Amino acid sequence: MACFDVAIIGGGISGVGIAQYAAAAGYSTLLIEKGEIGGQTSANSSKLIHGGLRYLETGQINLVRKSLLERRHLLNLAPSLVKAVPFYIPVYDNSQRSPWTIRAGLSMYALLSEFDPLGQFVSVPAVHWHRFKGLKLSGLKAVFQYWDAQTDDKLLTQAVARSAQALGAEVYAEA
């Protein structure tokens, strides 16, 4: 019977990430998944690799900075799996946050991204608002566009598992 320094149960993104890290650090590593790698919780995520914009509101500055940095790393490391996607924030007369507040938050986001192009935002001119299908124009005060990233979470999880294996981890799935 083989002995391992590290045994991981669960082949979601956390499990395969730990396996990859442990194998890279030189630990003999075993990962066991009862089903398909990335086939459970990790396959049912929001599919976003987000920079943490929403965490600015609660003052989690370091988390936003770290999220933006990790997003940048993933975009660089796995460009075939992680893609930049534009997001839009409409601000209405009755919105909880004013255009000024949204602009301030997006400016902080840009600063925390260290002015990475994907940390930047624009205020979409009113003459272009009609181009957004389904956008209610009545009471609309502003529209901001910023960037985040999206992935196929299952494929990303499987790629990390293959990397863990290449680093020496033993991975058993559908056991």
Residue spans for each PLM region:
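Helix-loop-beta segment of a Rossmann-like dinucleotide-binding subdomain
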Residues: 129-167
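Short amphipathic alpha-helical face segments that pack within enzyme cores
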Residues: 17, 50-51, 155, 159
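Beta1/beta-strand and adjacent pyrophosphate-binding region of the FAD-binding site
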Residues: 1-14
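Gly/Ala-rich phosphate-binding loop of Rossmann-like dinucleotide-binding domains
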Residues: 19, 23-24, 163
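Glycine-rich FAD pyrophosphate-binding loop
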Residues: 23-43
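A conserved beta-strand/loop element that lines the FAD pocket in flavoprotein oxidoreductases
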Residues: 168-175
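Dinucleotide-binding Rossmann-like beta1-alpha1 core, especially the glycine-rich loop
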Residues: 47-133
